[in-house]
Amino acid sequence: MKRVYSIKSKNELDLVFKEKKSVGNGYFVIYFIPHETPHFKYAISIGKKFGNAVERNQAKRRLRYIVSNYSNYINPKYRFVIVVRPQSNLLPYDLIKENITKLLIKAKLIEKEAQN
């Protein structure tokens, strides 16, 4: 996934958190806002309570991979932030993908038919 797809500045993150709409479950929350850009932008937020650095980095890698798989289906007019809750620490990859997919559909960031 190219670097242009990630939210890099604090101002962009603050904008998403300030004007947010959200969907969530016990493991993840997705905050999103519509924005006029040629492609979607996203960020991943994981708190320090989520295991050690190795586990946090592994979770971020998994989420980046899931988002990159759906990159052709995600609505390009949105910015979103995926917040990872500590309970998701014990989930296997298949359940992480299932939960993220359901939340992306619920937020209408992807269509139901795009589900892999």
From Swiss-Prot:
Biological process terms in GO annotation: tRNA 5'-leader removal
Domain of life: Bacteria
InterPro entries in the record: Ribosomal_Su5_D2-typ_SF, Ribsml_uS5_D2-typ_fold_subgr, RNase_P, RNase_P_CS
Annotated Gene Ontology cellular component terms: ribonuclease P complex
EC number: 3.1.26.5
Reactions catalysed, as given in the entry: Endonucleolytic cleavage of RNA, removing 5'-extranucleotides from tRNA precursor
Key word Cytoplasm present: no
UniProt keyword list: Endonuclease, Hydrolase, Nuclease, RNA-binding, tRNA processing
Molecular functions per Gene Ontology: 3'-tRNA processing endoribonuclease activity; ribonuclease P activity; tRNA binding
Gene3D superfamilies: 3.30.230.10
Keyword set includes Chloroplast: no
HAMAP family hit by this protein: RNase_P
Function: RNaseP catalyzes the removal of the 5'-leader sequence from pre-tRNA to produce the mature 5'-terminus. It can also cleave other RNA substrates such as 4.5S RNA. The protein component plays an auxiliary but essential role in vivo by binding to the 5'-leader sequence and broadening the substrate specificity of the ribozyme.
PANTHER family named among the record's database cross-references: RIBONUCLEASE P PROTEIN COMPONENT (PTHR33992:SF1)
Family: Belongs to the RnpA family.
Subunit and partners: Consists of a catalytic RNA component (M1 or rnpB) and a protein subunit.
Protein name, entry field: Ribonuclease P protein component
Species this chain originates from: Acholeplasma laidlawii (strain PG-8A)
